[in-house]
């Protein structure tokens, strides 16, 4: 992979992050009810600074609801969320994104008529300091920020070897490339925790293997944590250091991939069901 644009964090930055032992995410007794239905209950999870954690479970178990709680699409009925040691109660989706959580979605949500680079620049918006009037009046600060955004967008695209596609229309990209672009755009917000909702959906085995390599590269290069929802068990077991299994809105098991694979409750509730279905 070309390293022309890759920006590796400084040794001082990496040392600072390494010295900070505060978990990137802690949830305590997190839950939400919709009417009289409990969708998620007693969701307790801790994610370390550079951990890759998987959240698995049958369809309808509440996995995406958990992501919606973490990103404040939904406000929890009960419980506490600590992001980098600080409570997120009262925050909205924009505020929690600025505080350090970025995500992708099950369904691609790109601006298909814009270029690849412009999609990444939209993700960079929160970290840019240019005001509205500097943009309208085309002040020097505006042009400086445009230059910085262009360079940063290419740096991020190079992680997935997509810098040569910068001027292509996002909607013209193959499906797998569009999913990678979503991850790049999420990274552009400079998160400390990246949430990936079924990142391998629609990918062939070769693309999935490349995705695994790139997720590790993202974690190692930017020293961030990654939490993913995924039905591809080869990906989950191959990349995650910790796994939580959700069933009917509750965590039924937490542990290493090996521990999860050998957990009777998990085999019955999820992995075993897949075997019965011949998957």
Task: State the predicted function of each range.
Residues 2-279:
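Glycine-rich phosphate-binding loops of nucleotide-dependent enzymes
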């Amino acid at each position: 992979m070309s390293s022309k644009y890759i920006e590796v964090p400084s040794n001082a930055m990496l040392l600072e992050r390494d010295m900070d032992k505060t978990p990137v995410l802690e949830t305590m007794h997190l839950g939400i009810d919709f009417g009289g239905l409990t969708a998620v209950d007693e969701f307790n999870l801790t994610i370390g600074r550079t951990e890759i954690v998987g959240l698995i479970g049958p369809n309808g178990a509440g996995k995406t609801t958990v992501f919606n709680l973490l990103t404040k699409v939904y406000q929890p009925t009960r419980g506490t969320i600590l992001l980098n040691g600080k409570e997120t109660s009262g925050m909205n989706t924009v505020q929690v994104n600025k505080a350090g959580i970025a995500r992708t979605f099950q369904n691609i949500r790109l601006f298909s008529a814009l270029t690849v680079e412009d999609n990444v620049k939209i993700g960079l918006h929160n970290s840019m300091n240019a005001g509205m009037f500097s943009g309208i009046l085309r002040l020097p600060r505006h042009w400086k920020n445009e230059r910085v955004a262009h360079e940063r967008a290419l740096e991020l695209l190079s992680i997935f070897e997509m810098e040569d596609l910068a001027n292509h229309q996002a909607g013209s990209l193959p499906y797998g490339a569009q999913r990678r672009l979503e991850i790049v755009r999420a990274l552009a917000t400079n998160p400390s925790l990246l949430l990936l909702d079924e990142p391998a959906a629609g990918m062939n085995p070769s693309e999935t293997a490349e995705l695994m390599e790139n997720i590790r590269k993202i974690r190692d290069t930017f020293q961030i944590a990654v939490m993913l929802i995924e039905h591809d068990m080869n990906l989950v077991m191959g990349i995650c250091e910790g796994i939580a299994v959700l069933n009917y809105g509750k965590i039924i098991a937490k542990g290493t991939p090996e521990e999860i694979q050998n957990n009777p409750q998990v085999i019955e509730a999820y992995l075993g069901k897949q075997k019965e279905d011949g998957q």
